[in-house]
Curated annotation (Swiss-Prot):
It comes from Arabidopsis thaliana (Mouse-ear cress). Low expression in leaves, roots, flowers and siliques. Expressed in pollen and in cells of the stigma surface. Residues 259-290 have a biased composition (Basic and acidic residues). Residues 293-309 have a biased composition (Polar residues). This is Phosphoinositide phospholipase C 4.
């Protein structure tokens, strides 16, 4: 960020060369103004002045002088490549370097800071769906590798579908499809090796059990031998409150669900087919980045083969009616810390709270919508003590996902996502769980724990008054030239970047804005401010996408991030961008300013 300029060239029609001035932008006006304000016009900023700036501008209370000195020393070490300093202060360029450093000046904190001593049901939990699949739901391979990847991305709930492999062995696969199986032992070892690599808070394994009592006994032995003292034993059917994440650190919890967890009747299945693709927000945010798993045409080739199997599965319904599927092996039953079942009597009865029992209920994304519309207060009351898991509808063959907001608004702890289903819905999920240090547990807002009879009164209407207003200024961006080839975006010129900025959350809060296009530059400066009034800031996510404008083709993707609004730090911050798969770019970031009013 030194303000240097040099010429860059692009080949045109093979024989012509177009030259562009490649400008490395200096500090933007907001940075210069902030520097002058706290140095009072001096050319250098002392650690004491930086301490005052961080305390007054950051909105996080008192910053210690030791922390300010650490930052000054680190900036000088990195920028000037020297171990000992003749001076201990920052120039304007040094200060700009600090503000643009994603690790020294991040937009959200990277430490666990929420109260972790409440019962487990008081938290949203990062949850995977069919965690063993490498791709689509119909024909992809099953493997232990996606499980390891999910756990290292912060997922705390892993799902395994257990099926007989012959008469004496057990495998993991997506039943009645063409997916290739993987050995259960490999999956268990993968969980053990990766469970607490990123977060020390508990991992829950949900088992979809299609086994005989003999094989249940074998599974119980495998689980016990693999995890040993890591296993947590608990009878959730005889308690009024579940332990806290803090109490369950580095513990593995086993939960079961019925082999078919659907509560829907045939009319719901018909509705599912008719709603395919309805939940997309492409009309507002533009086309979804290209599918990274399977195209629909690829899936159509295997769908017809699977439909007959799935239809037969639907007609048979839950294995609960089959005595061979009951939890008959006592060694297996003893492992179950969180019990799940399919209560009889319909949706209303399923949501009934038993004061002497804690359980987990699973609903499809469509059935959740029905439950919220008809029994919203009951859903919230149920989730204040019990666990509610939401899973993708059956037609998401390509492992796509749904918008998770309706689940969070209803207090559902486990919004089960296909972690290989890259796209905007998964970006939102990853954004939510960047909160609380990325530990995989996020404390639910107080209004979702309100025990009053009218527990759903909080749900915002179109005319809800904002509780808080977030001002966001997109100052500039940098780093693309280090992370991408010079011709990645345009073959004949530097890129033309613009930024989409918006809110995902309560319906009344959802909005999208965008900057103007900055043409022919690798270091675009937008200096565009947006204002977002928020009725439910506790569940709001700030969505940011960078695109490169193309006149005749689809705009190119240039990075994305989602940030929990409740975690955003005030002031000028360096915001790292991620690729379609949620992997952080090495250098690409935005300089943004945040203010709450």
């Amino acid at each position: 960020m030194e303000g240097k300029k040099e010429m860059g060239s692009y080949k045109f029609c093979l024989i012509f060369t177009r030259k562009f001035r490649m400008t490395e932008s200096g500090p933007v006006e907001d940075v210069r103004d902030l520097f002058e304000k706290y140095t009072e016009g001096d050319a250098h900023m002392s650690p004491e002045q930086l301490q005052k700036l961080m305390t007054e501008e950051g909105g996080e209370g008192e910053t210690s002088l030791e922390e300010a000195e650490r930052i000054v020393d680190e900036v000088l070490r990195r920028k000037h490549h020297i171990a000992k300093f003749t001076r201990r202060n920052l120039t304007l360029d040094d200060f700009n370097y600090y503000l643009f450093s994603t690790d020294l000046n991040p937009p959200i904190a990277d430490q666990v800071h929420q109260n972790m001593d409440a019962p487990l049901s008081h938290y949203f939990i990062f949850t995977g769906h069919n965690s063993y699949l490498t791709g689509n739901q119909l024909s992809s391979n099953c493997s232990e590798l996606p499980i390891a990847d999910a756990l290292r991305r912060g997922v705390r709930v892993v799902e395994l579908d257990l099926w007989p492999r012959g008469t004496d062995d057990v495998c993991v696969k997506h039943g009645r499809t063409l997916t290739k199986e993987v050995k259960l032992g490999k999956c268990l070892e993968s969980i053990k090796a990766n469970a607490f690599a990123i977060s020390k808070y508990p991992v829950i394994i949900t088992l979809e059990d299609h086994l005989t009592p003999k094989l249940q006994f074998k599974v119980a032995k495998m689980i016990t031998q693999t995890f040993g003292d890591m296993l947590y034993y608990h009878d959730s059917q005889g308690c009024q409150e579940f332990p806290s994440p803090e109490e369950l650190k580095e513990k593995i919890l086993i939960s079961t669900k019925p082999p078919k967890e659907y509560l829907e009747a045939n009319d719901t299945k018909e509705k599912d087919n008719g709603e395919k693709g309805k939940d997309s927000d492409e009309d507002v945010w533009g086309k979804e980045p290209e599918d990274l798993i399977s195209t629909q045409s690829d899936l159509d080739k295997v769908t017809s083969s699977v439909n007959d199997l799935n239809q037969d599965d639907e007609e048979r319904g839950s294995c609960e009616s089959d005595t061979s599927c009951q939890l008959q092996a006592p060694e297996y039953k003893r492992l179950i810390a969180i019990h799940a079942g399919k209560p009889k009597g319909g949706l209303r009865m399923a949501l009934k709270v038993d004061p002497n029992k804690i359980r987990r209920l699973s609903l499809s994304e469509q059935l959740l919508e029905k439950a919220v519309a008809s029994y919203g207060a009951d859903v919230i009351r149920f989730t204040q003590k019990n666990f509610l898991r939401i899973y993708p509808k059956g037609t998401r063959f390509n492992s796509s996902n749904y918008k998770p907001q309706i689940g969070w608004m209803s207090g559902a702890q486990m919004i089960a996502f296909n972690m290989q289903g890259y796209g905007r819905a998964l970006w939102l999920m990853e954004g939510m769980f960047r909160a609380n240090g990325g530990c995989g547990y996020v404390k639910k807002p107080d209004f979702l724990m309100d025990a009053s009879p009218n527990g759903q009164d909080f749900y915002p209407k179109d005319n809800s008054s904002p509780k808080k207003t977030l001002k966001v200024k997109v100052c500039m961006g940098d780093g693309w030239l280090l992370d991408f080839k010079k011709t990645h975006f345009d073959s004949y010129s530097p890129p033309d970047f613009f930024v989409r900025v918006g809110i995902a959350g309560a319906p009344v809060d959802e909005v999208m804005e965008k900057t103007k296009i900055e043409y022919d530059t690798w270091t675009p400066i937008w200096n565009k401010e947006f204002t977002f009034p928020l009725a439910v800031p506790e569940l709001a996510l700030l969505r940011v996408e960078v695109h490169e404008h193309d006149v005749n083709e689809k705009d190119d993707f240039g990075g994305q991030t989602c940030l929990p609004v409740s975690e955003i730090r005030q002031g000028i911050r360096a915001v790292p961008l991620f690729n379609r798969k949620g992997v952080k770019y090495s250098s690409t970031r935005l300089l943004m300013r945040f203010e709450f009013v």
